[in-house]
Amino acid sequence: MQLRYFKSILPPADQYQKITSLTWAPNNSRLAAVSTDKVVYLFDENGEKRDKFKTKAAEANNPNTYIIRAMAFSPDSTKLAIAQSDNIVFIYRLVDPDTGAEKKSICNKFPQACAVTSLVWPKDRPNEVVFGLADGKVRLGMLKNNKSYTCYAHPENSYVVALASSLNGQNVISGHMDGAIWKFNFPAEEGGTPTSSQLVVHSCVPYSLGWGSCIAAAGNDNRVVFYDLNGREIRSFDYSNNDEVREFTTCAFNPSGDTVVFGTYNRFYMYTFNIQRNDWEEAGHKQIDNFYAVSAASWKPDGSKMTVGSMTGAVDMYDACVKRHMYKGKFEFTYVSKSAVIVKTLKTGMRIVLKSVYGYEIEKINIYHDRYLIARTTYTLLMGDLDTCKLSEIPWDSDGSEKFHFENERVCMVHYAGELHIVEYGRNDVLGTCRTEHMNPYLISAVVQEARGIASESKKLAYLIDLQTVRIQDLMAPVGSTLATVNHDTKVDWLELNQRGTHLLFRDKKRHLHLFSLSGQERTTLLNYCQYVQWVPGSDVIVAQSRNNLCVWYSVNKPDNVTMFPIKGEVVDIERHNHRTEVIVDEGINTVSYALDEALIYFGAALEDQDYERAVQTLEPLELTPETEAQWMQLAEQALATNQLVIAERCYAALGDIAKSRFLHKVVKKAQQAAKEFGGDGTDAWSVRAMMAQLNKQWPVSESLLLAQGKVDDAITLYQDNHRWEDAIRVADSTHHANAAALKQQYLTWLLETGQEEQAGAVKEREGDYLAAIGLYLKGGLPGRAAQVVMSVHNVNWDPALLDSILASLAKAGLYERAGELYEHMSRSSEAMQSYRRGHAYRKAIDLARREFPAEVIIIEEEWGDWLVTQKQMDAAINHFIESGATLKAIKAAIDCRQFAKAAGIIEVLDPREAMPYFRRIAQHYETTGALEEAERYYIRADMARDAVEMYSRAGKWEAAQRVARGYLTESEMRAFYRAKAAEFEAAHKLKEAEKAYLAAGGDDVDKAIAMYKRNKMYDQMIRLVTQYRKEKVPEAHTLIAQQLEVEGNLREAEKHFVEAKDWKSAVQMYRQVNQWEDALRVAKVYGGVNASKQVAYAWALTLGGDDGAQLLKKMGLLDHAIEYAVESGAFAQAFEMTRAGAKHKLPEVHLKYAMFLEDEGRFAEAEAEFISAGKPKEACDMYMHNQDWDAAMRIAERYDPTMVSEILVSQARVAVERKQWLPAEGLFIKAKRPEAALKMYRDARMWNDALRVAEQYLPTKVAEVQMELLSGQGAGGGSGGASADAVINKARGFERNNDYARAIETYLSLTAQDTSNQDQLEHCWGQAAQLAINYQRHRMKDVVNTVSERLQEIGRHQAAGELHESIDDAQGAIRAYCAGRLWDKARTLAGTNPTFSRYIEDQYNNYLLQNQQADELASRGGQHAQQAIEMYVARDEWAKVHELAAQQGPEVASNYALKHAERRFKQGDYAQAAQVFAQHGITAQPQYFELYKSIAQGVLHASQGDRNPVAEKSLRDMMYRLVNVLRSGGGAGKYKVDTDAFQNYYLAAHYLTCAAAAKEQGLKDIAAMNLTSVLRYVGPTIPADRAFYEAGLAWYEAGRKNMAFVMLNRFLDLSDAMDEPDSSAAVIENADFSDTDIPYDFTIPERAYCTESQREDVRNLVLEISMDRSSDQSLALKACEHCGKPTYEANLTCHFCKKKYDPCVVTGYPIQSYDRVVFKNNGPELNAIRDMWNKWVEAFGTDPVTGMQAAPMY
């Protein structure tokens, strides 16, 4: 324990102001402190002052000289007791109990005869406060009556100096002035006697006295002594020899009682109890200088704080803890003692004290779901809920492997060692225990329901004993009695009790939802498919989802009344808030909610609380629906059960049960009258009880109540009113009523009037009037009763006519047995025999026959057996057949009822030919029972040796199977047998046996043995078999093995196999990849020679690098070659490394090549360094010059190669010339000493003035030449050089003014777009030049206008150019200008009707449209333009427009573009789209495209299952239909017969697939299966065989024809197995089942499987299932040929006997019989079909299956 100073909450005064008392409120919310100033200060839990109030004297007139001796808070923290020295104890109320507001008022006061010296308020005693007096008495103040009583008095009236209460509040000790410590015990039970006794006499006055886990006392002798509860001293600490310790003044235990603080002068000592040593220890002391004596001390009830007060009024607060611990950053654990921890939620600041009630040390704490506490001590387990602040502690001993479950907020579930423990939060015991291994939270439901209203407390648990048994346990029973056990036939996967524990909901693995009522012990199935279910929180309403329906049960007592809503998504939750209940449904994109009827939900809550008025108010506003009707009924029944008659009357009135409502109204009136007479509610009155018994149909109860009151007539009337005449007559007879006889006659009359002749006849029979009784029986249609009367009454001569009438009635009623008895009674044996046999009363018939007709006994025995067989009583029929000698019938009956022992015994006497059909079934029986030898014998006798072999194989008796096979099977059967056994042995990993079986089978099965050893990595065995049987594949086998061993890391073995395969290079590569160069070099040297070893050595050197690699290469003479190779491959680091290590003479060359590489990479700075290192500065300069980095180039030239300076300057100047930067270029040329280049630059640019200037300055010899060029006119207008445009214009205007128009024109024209960006200015100048030419220079007018026009068009002024041409009547030039500027309307207007101009304009316009890809405009122009538009659309991939335009151009164009479109889609792999294009837009029959068509067909039909597209198959069908028609109509069918037949096959295969898909969608399963069977004719190149047989087999299985499904799925499995083997073909597959069919036999095995492996396994299981079905013959269906009458495969288009050919049905593909043919033709091809199939198709679709045209049934 550590005490750390926290804060001072009251500062010290400058004078004496003793803190006389400190006390904490038990709820930790307040601290009260008082000093000698008589003011009580109130602080919050953190020590902040919140309030204060001044105390009062005992009497208002008394002087204010009292002091406060002690204070204590009440256990509920709302009151404060103050003991005062002026002979009184005041109780202050601090909190208003009604409003919770803070309010200080005196609620109790206890005046005494002398001064009050001390006070305590024991725990859990809110109305009892204990205080001590100066006269030695300890008194008890009772708050309820405001009186005080003496608990005990000191014999010598010794002053009470201290009081202390035990931790549990059941005891109080007091310390007295004479050193005695007394103990007072409160009575253990109410009314008991309290006791008191002297505990011990302390060594001094025990001013400091406390009681924790033991009693501690100290005083002025400086000793601290600890006593046990009997007063024996257990430990003491003596400080009498310590001068720094003075007398002890106060004592305070922490809430756990294991730590205590004693105050003394300027310090306080702390002591703790060591559990391990079972002793008290000093834990240290706190020195507080200038604090003076500690006058008061108090611990906070949670143990986290300790406060002390001083003589000067100071109050200090200390933080007390053993340790602190942060948990997951969300919680803080403060260990205030070893057995108490404060758990604080950091987010909310909420605190809870986790404390062991047994005082054990808390070792570990965990918090689950941020809410639930789990703590451990050595012997207990602590649990708590942070939200409700409820804690529990239970004894616990485990190894820590228990699992906790917190799904239920009321209880904690602990699963350990197969047992489930239920602990309710807030209780320190285990609520219940059960054994279960199924600890899924969805498989356990616990209900803890507190008492509400009249409803009692309920605690129940539902759990699984096993996965099919639910047990419901009552947790309130002493040992947990079982309320119900629910046995179910399917595994349960969810269960939950409702909140009251009256009903259990559970769901099984089949998604069936069940409701179990605990009261009625009844189970009801609510749903046959349920994917979500939940009780609505806080109610008995059930919400469930069944597929797309939301189901709600508002009343669990009426499970048939369900409310359903259609929904689209999945129910995810149920939310209740703001008086609204909503079901949340996730629809994928969004979430929606469905509101439930809140009124009906509230009704359930009201009924649960038995608040019937509220229940009625809830139901009254609602309409009467099935839900509300059920709830009215539920309320009525519950109201009747609790005698709420008015409520029940209202309920039945609401239900429309007027009779019950009126009856209850009478009962209510009776009860009201009884209440007035006798008091109470009147329901106990005998008349009310009798009526209620009558209502509940408790007739004996009602009768006894009426007879007890002497109400005989009322009792008789009661029975008469309810038509219980016999009870009425019984009452009348028993009471000797005067009207008893009349009552009987009245009863008989009533029976006759109501048609109850049977009852009337029974009355007459009892009276002895037999004739009347017989007449009544016959009248009532009861001839059997009449015959019974005749046979039971003897010595009566009955009228023969009467007897004949009875016999006729018996025959008419079918009572032949009774008629036979009557005939026998009348000694008419023949008629009796006939009646017995007609009524199947064979026992009586045989008895009669043995007496009268012995010869007929055998006949009747067989007849009896036949009849028993018809009644499915085969077991009983066996003996009758044996008795009659019908042996075959006896055997059949014995087998049918599985009496095989009897059948075997009977069959031995039969002829073998007769017994043959039964041998197989008997053999199968013996096989199932394990009698294999007997089974073998019967299989052999049944000529089914193959089945005997398979039986022994299944049983694992291989030798016996071989014995039977060798003795009875054919060669082919033996081979099939060996294959099957080999596969079985391989699966069992019996590889030697499997090898023998494969080799015994021979042929391709040898490859299976080889593959088996390969799969099992037994490579030696594999090579042995390959060498022995497949010598040509030995190298390939070695290579495969080597590759596998390489992957596995077995390199030595892999090398061996590579070498054996003559592939040593792969071995070398293998070793290189794993850096085993020695081995690689060894293999290369041994098998590849010197050159190979050199290559490996070079590669090795590269990996070694540095000197090692170079030395290796040098040693082998490959160093130079390696360097060159490294440079060429860009491995410069290796190249440098090798060069420096062994070939330094090549270093400059490597630097140069590396520099060139860096230059190409754009890394110029690095390249520069490498060029310099290579001694090539010129190349570095060239690099920078190339990149125009002149400064860098100049820097290198000046430093390394000055001869390059001039060249760099010239290059830079030329770049400036290209950029027209004349002056910089001139300066660079001059600097490079190349003035002639500067002169040439200006002359080329016609800048004559600058050229003349340069010549005069630098080249005087060139001055004359330049002047001559200028004077010759080449420089006209150009003398301005770089002058501005304004200068040129001014110069031209000057020429105009001087009438020098020629030079003016040249000057205007000298102005170009390079001189100015002002296009308006340019247009004006050029226009002025043209105008001058027009006006004054007519001879050059046209040239000038053309020049101006060209320039205007260059700057985009086409309209101005055209108008210029028009001004000189140059229409052609104007039109050209307008067309160039796209001014088509102006051009057309100018052209008028001139055809030449118009044609030119349209050509230009078309060229413009083409150049700008304006396809729509081109298309609208038609003709060849449309063709051009189509090509544009093709380029843009706008195929819809392509086909639309192409269709307008004719079918040939349409088919050509369809071909282009399809080709493009085919190349993109979109076979479906390609087929659709041809189907929709036409197809050409040119032979060069036939391969394309076939490839598209194969792409569609050979698609994998995931890529398969029924729409694509339909498009392919339409495409091939078009193609075949085009070929036939164009005469190509004969010319290209093979191709046409192939296309026809593709068409038919696609047609049947399309029809099958459509039929399947409409539920026409037989048509779908027939179509898919017809597809089988085209397996191989047309459609993959595995897909065809797979789909056909599944279709027949869905259609219910298992024999067809078995054969086809079995073929599919054979194909799948063949596909797993390399180089397999269909020829190796057994074809017996398809030998006489038109299904191809020899075809290519597909390379890619159509189905997944899981689907193949499903098919295997399905085939196995069908094979086990003995009712299936497991062969293809046959039919009789119409021509020859022989049986042939039902889908054959050609009879395999007579070769008769049949037309295929367009609906199914099946052959059409002549008598069943219908022909349909409607402006299309003639369609032949089977009548029934056609009608089924047309009724489903309304169209024919080929063209899709409207069609009608044909009968």
Swiss-Prot record:
Q: Where in the cell is it found?
A: Cytoplasm, Cytoskeleton, Cilium basal body
GO cellular component, as recorded: ciliary basal body; cytoplasm; intraciliary transport particle B; motile cilium
Phenotype upon changing L1615P: In fla11-ts; temperature-sensitive mutant that leads to defects in intraflagellar transport particle turnaround at the tip when transferred to nonpermissive temperature
Q: Repeat TPR: residue ranges?
A: 597-628, 696-729, 754-788, 813-846, 858-892, 916-949, 988-1023, 1048-1081, 1219-1252, 1285-1318, 1355-1388, 1455-1489, 1586-1619
Q: Which InterPro entries match?
A: Quino_amine_DH_bsu, TPR_IF140/IFT172/WDR19, TPR_IFT80_172_dom, WD40/YVTN_repeat-like_dom_sf, WD40_repeat_dom_sf, WD40_rpt
Which residues form the WD repeats? 14-53, 63-102, 111-153, 155-194, 198-238, 289-328, 487-525, 526-563
| Source organism, top-level taxon | Eukaryota
Ordered alphabetically, the record's keywords are:
Cell projection, Cilium, Cytoplasm, Cytoskeleton, Developmental protein, Repeat, TPR repeat, WD repeat
- Entry similarity comment: Belongs to the IFT172 family.
Its biological purpose:
Required for the maintenance and formation of cilia and participates in the control of flagellar assembly/disassembly at the tip. Involved in regulating the transition between anterograde and retrograde intraflagellar transport at the tip.
According to the record's subunit comment, the protein's assembly and interactions are: Component of the IFT complex B, the core composed of IFT25, IFT27, IFT46, IFT52, IFT74, IFT81 and IFT88 as well as associated subunits IFT20, IFT57, IFT80 and IFT172. Interacts with microtubule end-binding protein 1 (MAPRE1/EB1).
| Descriptive protein name | Intraflagellar transport protein 172
Q: Which organism is it from?
A: Chlamydomonas reinhardtii
Which gene name does the record give? IFT172
